[in-house]
Every structure is written in C-alpha cells, then in structure tokens.
Amino acid sequence: MVKKKSIFTQELIVGIVLIALYLVFRTISADFGKYTTFLSMMDISYYYALMAIGVAFPLITGGVDLSIGTGMICYALAGGCLIRFYNVPTGVAMLVSILFGVGIGLANGVLISVMGLPPFLATLCTCMITRGLGSVVTGSFAIPWPTAKQPNGWFHSIFKITLADKTKLPLGLLWIILLTLLMQFVLAHTRFGRYTIAIGSNKEAAILSGINVKFYHVMVYMVSGLFAGLAAIAYAAVIKTVQPGTGAGMELDAIGGAIVGGVSASGGYGTIYGTVIGAYVILVLKQGLPYIGFNANMQQIITGFVLIGAVTIDIVKRKVIK
C-alpha cells in the first residue's frame, strides 16, 4: 500500500524545488527568462516526460530499463524511414514506432522474467541493439520527418498550436498532463498498478499471494516500451531530423527524473505525479546551467550529485519508515 501523506509531501517538496530552480535561473539570466526559451524547454520536455512516465513502472518493481533512450531514437528512425522511402502514411508510421517500442519492451520482459537475466544486463543489451539497429537500417544517415508545412506533417500540431496572432502554445504540455493523470490512476487504482507496487515491495510475498510475477514483469517493460514509442513521435515532432547513434544518456535523465520525483531506487514506491515533476527538475537543471556559465561536463557533475542526493534521501526515508 502507498502512504498518501508521504507521497504528497514528496511531490510538494519536488514541486517547490522545481519552481525555485526555475526562478533562480530566470533571476540570474535574462535570456533564460525569455518566452522563446520557455517554449524550447517545453518542446524538449515532451519526450523526456514520456520516457520518465514509462520507466517509472520497471523502477517501481525494482528493475530498470536502460533501452529507452537509444530505443526512442531507433523507433523514430523506423517511422521516418517508412515515410521517406516507402510513402507510408504518417499515422501508420507513428503506429509502427509505438508498436516497435512495445515489441522491444516485450523482449526486455521476456529476457528478464522468462530467461532470468538481471534487468540491468537485459536492457543494456537491447540498448546496444537498438542503437546499432538504427544506424544499420539507415546507413548512418539522418532521417527527416515531414515538416509542419507538408501535408503529412499534421502530427506537429499535436505538440504545438499557433494562434491567430502567431503566439505558439505548448499544446504537448496538455497531453503530458492528461497522460500523467491517466497513468497515476492506473498505478494507484488498478490491479496492474497495485501488483506492480506489490512486486517491488516484496517479490517473494507477491508470489506467495498468487500474483503472476513473471506476467506483470513483462507488462511493466511493455509499458516502458510503449512510452518510449510515444516519446519517439514527440522527438520527431520537436527535433524534426533524427540522427542515428544518438539517444545514449537520455535514459539516465528519465530515470533520474523518476528518482528525484520520489520513485524508490529499490522499488515498491513512487507516483507518476512525482515522476513527471522530477523529470522537469532535471530538464530545468540541464537547460538552465549553460545560461549561468556551466559547460556540459559541469552539467553532468552537478546532475550526478543531485541524483546521489535523491537516492540518499530515499534510503534514509526507508530506514526511518522501518
């Protein structure tokens, strides 16, 4: 069972940190406070938030999915190739990207549940496979998706809407909010969600209580793959041209966001609300640091310390509860 008081406290703290972080960067740098910077950050946030929502489920079971970053790129490349070389309708290509993600998630689940591979090793293997596969299929050439002005570029409007006065609004943020509410409901109020938490809390007890642990393990990785596929579409809409061989490291930002948002690194605890807020904390941190003079290396160092702090807080909190 999830303790509501603890959950809301965690989310509130992370939400305050997010607001404070944004205000600090905006105060120090006038450029960071520009509306165009905000829109750019919102664009990037779509695929990061989607990956974080998906990976939260394996994390809550005590597992991990390292394939979501390179997988997202691979699925976007697959859909882009279908449109570019085979004139496949955009909607069909998007569906293929999503199903590709679900398929890799299924493979991860089978490797872990049926074959008994550790989640870290199994998903590391599929991470390498998807990264290489994207390069092989495309010949290492970048694959452009249709632009918003092209007839088959309608999918861009899912993530951004332009008003009559040319003001652009981050419509994708609305989809993130709706998906967050939906998946939080799934986690907290469905059998799938309750069993996911139960497996992460005590796998042996879950087995003894009659839960088909292998089945639900496969399911959580399919959910992770599903959201990586959705993230692939968001990535294609925002970035427009997908470059093979990229994506490595994005999974760490998504996982880091989930942990910062309160998902326990050892499983059994977490919310989708907190996960998404945590993903935005990592995003604001990574986007804001360059504006105050920190280079890419320093960004990695600071982000690493933030994650260490989040994991330490989780460990201390679990000891206090015990």
Model region roles, listed by residue range:
Residues Y221, F227-A228, V238-G304:
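Transmembrane alpha-helical segments in multi-pass inner-membrane proteins
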Residues M1-L23, T27, S201, I207-F215, ...:
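Cytosolic-side transmembrane-helix boundaries in multi-pass membrane proteins
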Residues P89, A93-M94, G103-N108, I112, ...:
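Helix-loop-helix "hairpin" substructures at the membrane interface of multi-pass membrane proteins
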Residues K5-S6, F120-T190, Y216-M219, I239-G247, ...:
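Transmembrane helix-bundle core of multi-pass membrane transporters
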Residues E11-I16, M41, A49, T70-C74, ...:
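Hydrophobic alpha-helical transmembrane segments
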Residues V17-G33, V137, Q184-R191:
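Structural signal for alpha-helical transmembrane segments and their membrane-water exit/capping regions
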Residues N87-C127, I277-G278:
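Alpha-helical transmembrane segments within multi-pass membrane transporters and channels
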Residues L23-Y86, V110-G116, G262-I272, F305, ...:
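Single transmembrane alpha-helix segments in multi-pass membrane proteins
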